[in-house]
């Protein structure tokens, strides 16, 4: 299943995996998953985190390695994101709830994820998604950015 991904997709997933894998040991633990989810404003219980890891953890060692992560991500790409999941993701970025993601909000979320971006990189990300040129990303532009990836 993972072999249907492009090299670019695999590279993006590797980058995402490394955001979760805080200690760089090649495995995501429930603690690391919890840290990332809390940085995104979620508050999962220990049991919920364990369920998430167990769902992906094919070899039963209690952690998620990159091949397991890749399998999960390729499966998730097949089940196109539900409207509610996309709305929820948009709300994570739209901190002030005004219906737009500004450069400052994007930088804030990416920093909380451990991604230090320069102003230029943040501006490039906004420009790539900002089809009407108003300097911020509205919900429609956000959806378009997700589905055109």
From Swiss-Prot:
Keyword Endoplasmic reticulum part of the UniProt annotation: no
Pfam families membership: EF-hand_7 (PF13499)
Superkingdom field: Eukaryota
Positions with a binding annotation for Ca(2+) 2: 57, 59, 61, 63, 68
Binding site for Ca(2+) 4: 130, 132, 134, 136, 141
InterPro entries referenced in this protein's UniProt entry, alphabetically: CALM/Myosin/TropC-like, EF-hand-dom_pair, EF_Hand_1_Ca_BS, EF_hand_dom
SUPFAM superfamilies: EF-hand (SSF47473)
PROSITE patterns linked to this entry: EF_HAND_1, EF_HAND_2
GO term, biological process aspect, one: establishment of localization in cell
A cellular component annotation (GO) from this entry: centrosome
Key word ATP-binding present: no
Entry keyword set: Calcium, Metal-binding, Repeat
Cysteine disulfide links: none
Ligand binding (Ca(2+) 3): 94, 96, 98, 105
CDD domains named among the record's database cross-references: EFh
Residues annotated for Ca(2+) 1 binding in this entry: 21, 23, 25, 27, 32
Family the UniProt entry places it in: Belongs to the calmodulin family.
Assembly and binders: Interacts with MYO10, the interaction is calcium-dependent and essential for MYO10 function in filopodial extension.
Further details from the record: Binds four calcium ions.
Role of this protein: May function as a specific light chain of unconventional myosin-10 (MYO10), also enhances MYO10 translation, possibly by acting as a chaperone for the emerging MYO10 heavy chain protein. May compete with calmodulin by binding, with different affinities, to cellular substrates.
Protein's UniProt name: Calmodulin-like protein 3
């Amino acid at each position: 299943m993972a072999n249907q991904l492009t090299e670019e997709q695999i590279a993006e997933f590797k980058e995402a995996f490394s955001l979760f894998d805080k200690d760089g040991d090649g495995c995501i633990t429930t603690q690391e998953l919890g840290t990332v989810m809390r940085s995104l404003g979620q508050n999962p219980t220990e049991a919920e985190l364990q369920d998430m890891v167990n769902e992906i953890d094919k070899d039963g060692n209690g952690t998620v390695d990159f091949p397991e992560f890749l399998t999960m991500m390729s499966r998730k790409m097949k089940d196109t994101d539900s409207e509610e999941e996309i709305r929820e993701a948009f709300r994570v970025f739209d901190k002030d709830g005004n219906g737009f993601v500004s450069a400052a909000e994007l930088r804030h979320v990416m920093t909380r994820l451990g991604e230090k971006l320069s102003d230029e990189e943040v501006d490039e990300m906004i420009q790539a998604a900002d089809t009407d040129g108003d300097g911020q990303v509205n919900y429609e532009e956000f959806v378009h950015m997700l589905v055109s990836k």
